[in-house]
Amino acid sequence: AGSAASTGSQSAGSASNVSASDFKVGAIYINKKSDTAGYTYAHHTGITKAMEALGMDVDKQLFIVDEVPEDDTQVGAAVDTLVGEGCNIIFGISFGYLNEMEVKAEEYPDVIFSHATGFKSNETNYNNYFGRIYQARYLAGLAAGLKSLETGNNNIGYVSAYDTEYAETCSGINGFTLGVQAVNPDATVYVKELGAWTDEVNEYAFAEELINSYNCGVIAQHCDS
């Protein structure tokens, strides 16, 4: 897939009137498209696999603007770039993109906007999607709890991007902890809040703190670092 570079203010053609071979997909990533693990990587893999399953040419039909922070000005610029490339649908994968994507959906009514993790829609060309990630975190908690029983260390660490201000991170913490407690009720989960979706330096520091100061034998994380 190529990186989108051009800008434009023209709306792409109506998605319903575009042939499969001419359909263009845009994606706005919060981290690097070259990541080999993590949240952005998972999204990129899902988008490319879906396109391949539909017989689309990823190299020619997917346009990406990556490393876009949760800043309305930069999100808006990324959308303009992708619309300028002729994209018929644009995926924005970070929660903080929701307001600017709503604005841009009104500006470009013939483009479909799909926002991951958000809650806004306009019932026409702006929708949202998300999986029940807390269920997977419950399973991760089960695995962590079983490992703690195996090692005899009941201290478990968890580095979360945010605390309880977002339903996603709050449910992730709770889901993981409930999984731990289901198999090891004597375990304690120590949570460190990163205050950002991605911060490699502090995530590393928190992991070391959980190991050295809290004697955690198992560590889980909910970040894109």
What is each model feature region?
Residues G2-S225:
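A residue-level marker of the well-folded mature domains of exported/periplasmic proteins
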